[in-house]
């Protein structure tokens, strides 16, 4: 049971990590777009 719970929480953390990095990459692209529009 504890192994299953640990595995589940690891997967959850993995998803959160991917989401965070994906959002960060999206923010970087938006910032670059704004910068090029401002120039």
From Swiss-Prot:
One Gene Ontology term, aspect cellular component: cytoplasm
Keyword terms: Cytoplasm, Developmental protein, Nucleus, Phytochrome signaling pathway, Signalosome
Main location: cytoplasm
Any one biological process term the GO annotation gives: red, far-red light phototransduction
Localisation: Cytoplasm; Nucleus
Function: Component of the COP9 signalosome complex (CSN), a complex involved in various cellular and developmental processes such as photomorphogenesis and auxin and jasmonate responses. The CSN complex is an essential regulator of the ubiquitin (Ubl) conjugation pathway by mediating the deneddylation of the cullin subunits of SCF-type E3 ligase complexes, leading to decrease the Ubl ligase activity of SCF. It is involved in repression of photomorphogenesis in darkness by regulating the activity of COP1-containing Ubl ligase complexes.
Subunit structure: Component of the CSN complex, probably composed of CSN1, CSN2, CSN3, CSN4, CSN5 (CSN5A or CSN5B), CSN6 (CSN6A or CSN6B), CSN7 and CSN8.
Family recorded in the similarity comment: Belongs to the CSN2 family.
Name of the protein in its database record: COP9 signalosome complex subunit 2
Species of the source: Brassica oleracea (Wild cabbage)
